Regions:
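Gly/Pro-rich hinge or "lid" segments in bacterial periplasmic/extracellular proteins
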Residues: 91-103, 193-228
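Surface-exposed binding/hinge segments that line
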Residues: 125, 159-207
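Aromatic-rich, solvent-exposed beta-strand/loop patch
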Residues: 109-114, 118, 133, 138, ...
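Aromatic- and charge-enriched surface segment that lines or borders ligand/interaction sites
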Residues: 52, 77-86, 112-156, 170, ...
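Sec/Tat signal peptide C-region and signal peptidase I cleavage site
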Residues: 20-26
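Bacterial N-terminal signal peptides
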Residues: 7-20
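N-terminal lobe/hinge region of extracytoplasmic solute-binding protein
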Residues: 26-118, 125, 148, 221-225
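N-terminal secretory signal peptides that target proteins for export/translocation
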Residues: 1-4
Length: 228
């Protein structure tokens, strides 16, 4: 689990040193952040976003106001009415945007990101310390599972990732997404927004003895990777 609250990169997360802004390594360049507009505001060694209070109290109960009701904690199925905030608060993404600069994202689950000059693909290297809430490490298999699952069960994600033709494990902690086009600088950021779901959780069985179905509604709080 990497500490984050509604997209906030906290001091707890930033304690882990980010990879260099651009670090040459063989035939790849590693980036700690990606931006469509100029250079990222924060360097590779920043401790927290300027608008974050690293000394803010931690713990307690978070209450979120919402209109209406809900009948599901499954944030990604098209069925039912999902509880407000479930997706953003329960699941971390490969990268996370800052609230004080546009079109820029920093590594969250991903330690660094790289892509060739023609942007025909993008590679994310996962942090060794990234874990789900049950202590299981976040693996490349979880990333690939999440990508394929979201495309399958949710038309919005299927459209969102329409230019992504494959997701492959390309190293012990590396996953590479290949595109059907070149030169689109936004595609790496789109993949960075991928929420990562636990494959082992959905491969397992619930208290009713049945395999958990990610397409159905559920009132059982799911296993996530975020701070709540």
């Amino acid at each position: 689990m990497i500490c984050r609250a509604t997209g906030i990169l906290t001091a707890s997360f930033a304690f882990f040193a980010l990879a260099g802004s651009v670090v040459a390594h063989a035939d790849e360049q590693r980036h700690h952040a990606l931006s469509l507009i100029g250079e990222p505001q924060y360097g590779p060694d920043f401790k927290h976003f300027d608008w974050v209070n690293p000394d803010a109290p931690k713990g307690g109960t978070l209450r979120i106001a919402a209109l209406g009701s809900f009948d599901s904690f499954n944030a990604y199925s098209i069925k039912g009415e999902v509880a407000n905030g479930v997706g953003a608060l329960l699941y971390d993404t490969l990268m996370d945007g800052s609230l004080d600069e546009p079109s820029t994202a920093y590594g969250l689950i991903a330690e660094w990101v790289s892509h060739p000059d023609d942007i025909s693909s993008v590679t994310f290297k996962l942090r060794d310390e990234a874990k789900f809430q049950d202590g299981e490490p976040i693996k490349v298999e979880d990333v690939i599972f999440s990508f394929k699952l979201l495309k399958k069960i949710n038309p919005s994600y299927n459209k969102y990732y329409k230019n992504v033709v494959s997701a492959e494990k390309t190293g012990d902690r590396k996953v590479t997404f290949s595109f059907d086009m070149k030169g689109n600088r936004e595609l790496p950021l789109i993949l960075g927004d991928l929420p990562v779901l636990p494959k082992h959780y959905y491969d397992g069985k619930g208290k009713n003895g049945k395999v958990r179905d990610p397409e159905k509604t559920t009132m059982t709080p799911p296993l996530g990777s975020g701070p709540y």
